[in-house]
């Protein structure tokens, strides 16, 4: 029915699927607006930033807002975080952040290197939709920098993160009318030190790092992208239980 259709389109356009122009969901745009106008040169508590979003027509709860602030600021989640983290925001292996009242965020000092042309931004004329612009204008395809994920009714997206330097080089080649058809943009994952293997059809595989310490001891110092420490412990536990000769593994490092 029409109500369901309207809800589906609202979810797609305003919540779940990021905009390809700036790589941001609506809440990310609201956070940047708040940081640029209310906390421009200020390190502020994540709880305070999340709370201020409610005055900018964000209607999905402070907990959701604070989670979005952490996502934009966490180093392990971004090649170029739009916010700078101050405090325990988690790591790739242990992604849990400290309580929002104990951690702080500020606008990344590199923000203006990538986002410009603020004088030509367009704004929604509907006062119920908030004061933030319809989209920000990055000078490289930001949708490729930090990667984006989103799932909604009938739609989904999943872009891998890449090095901004690699993206800029390809953009320059393209604007100089050079052929880039055979250039492969290899992903770059924050806080990942393992291997990225290029396969056919623009597919990629990540590989962790394991080293032999002694005859019966191996050290895993990196796990593939997409695994937290707990997920990898579950795999080792199953291997130890069913077939592989794993006698013991300590839960030591992050």
What are these regions (language model features)?
Residues 1-203:
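Catalytic phosphate-handling regions of large nucleic-acid enzymes and associated NTPases
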Residues 177-188, 197-254:
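Charged, surface-exposed alpha-helical interface/stalk elements
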């Amino acid at each position: 029915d029409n109500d369901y259709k309207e809800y589906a389109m609202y979810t797609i356009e305003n919540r779940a699927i990021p905009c390809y122009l700036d790589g941001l969901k609506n809440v990310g745009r609201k956070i940047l607006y708040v940081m640029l106008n209310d906390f421009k040169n200020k390190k502020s508590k994540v709880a305070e930033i999340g709370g201020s979003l409610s005055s900018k027509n964000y209607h999905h709860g402070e907990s959701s807002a604070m989670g979005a602030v952490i996502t934009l600021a966490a180093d392990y989640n971004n090649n170029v975080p739009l916010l700078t983290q101050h405090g325990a925001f988690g790591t790739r292996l242990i992604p849990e952040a400290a309580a929002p009242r104990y951690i702080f965020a500020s606008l990344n000092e590199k923000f203006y290197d990538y986002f410009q042309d603020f004088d030509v931004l367009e704004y929604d004329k509907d006062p119920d939709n908030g004061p933030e612009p319809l989209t920000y204008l990055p000078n490289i395809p930001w949708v490729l920098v930090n990667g984006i994920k989103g799932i909604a009714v009938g739609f989904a997206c999943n872009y891998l993160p890449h090095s901004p330097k690699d993206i800029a080089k390809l953009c320059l080649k393209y604007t100089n009318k050079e052929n880039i058809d055979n250039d492969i943009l290899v992903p770059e994952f924050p806080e990942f030190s393992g291997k990225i293997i290029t396969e056919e059809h623009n597919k990629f595989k990540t590989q962790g790092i394991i080293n032999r310490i002694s005859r019966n001891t191996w050290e895993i110092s990196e796990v593939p992208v997409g695994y937290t420490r707990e997920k990898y412990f579950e795999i080792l536990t199953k291997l130890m239980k069913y077939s592989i000769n794993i006698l013991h593994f300590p839960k030591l490092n992050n």
